[in-house]
Amino acid sequence: FEPDWIIGMGGGSPIDAAKAMWAFYEYPEVTFEDLIIPFNFPKLRTKARFCAIPSTSGTATEVTAFSVITDYEKGIKYPLADFNITPDVAIVDPKLAETMPPKLTAFTGMDAMTHAVEAYVSTMNCDYTDPLALHAIKMVHEDLEDSYDGDMEARARMHNAQCLAGMAFSNALLGIVHSMAHKTGAAYSGGHIVHGCANAMYLPKVIKFNAKDPVAASRYADIARFIGL
C-alpha cells in the first residue's frame, strides 16, 4: 500500500493528525520529537501529496502551515509548524459544516475570529494579510450568531470566513491568545478545554493588555471602525 495522495477530512484535529501521519509515512525513521522543532520538517511530497477537506469552520488547517497534536496523558498540546505541511489541495465545501451542533459552531467561530484578529494585530502583518484578516473579522461578526441559530447561508459564509482567516494567520502568525489557549487547553477540565472556548475567554483580556501599545491600539481601532462599532 503506497498511496500517492493522503486525504484528511473532518475537523481540525483529524486533519492535523493526518498531517503528522503524512510525515511519518514519508519518513518512518522520523520521531515526533523531531517534528515538534519549529520549521524542522523533512522535505515532504517524495511519496504523496495532501488534500484537506474541513467539516468544521474554525481551524483553517486546510490552508495553514500548522498542526496541533494533543497528548492527553501528559496534558500537553504540541504545535507543529512548517510550510511543508500546508496542504496541496483544500476542498472548502460549506455543505460539510451544516451538521455542526450549536456549541461546536460557537467554539469554532470564535477560533476563526481569534485567528483573524491576531493576524491583523500581529507585528508580522502586511498588505497581503490585512485584507484577508479584516474581511474574515467582518464576516464572523455578521454571521456567527445566525450560523449558531441554524441559518445555513450564514453557516456557509462562516466556512469561507474561517478559511480567509487561516490564509491571514498562516502568513502573519498569531499572538498570545493562541499561546495560552494551547498551553492550557489540555491541562484542565479532566484534560481538555475546547480550543475555541479558550480563545473566547482570553481574547478580551489580551486585547485590553495589547492595547497599551499605541500601534496595537490603532490596529484594534481599525477593526472596530471596519465592523461599525
Residue ranges, per PLM feature:
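Carboxylate- and glycine-rich phosphate/diphosphate-binding segment that chelates Mg2+/Mn2+
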Residues: 66-172
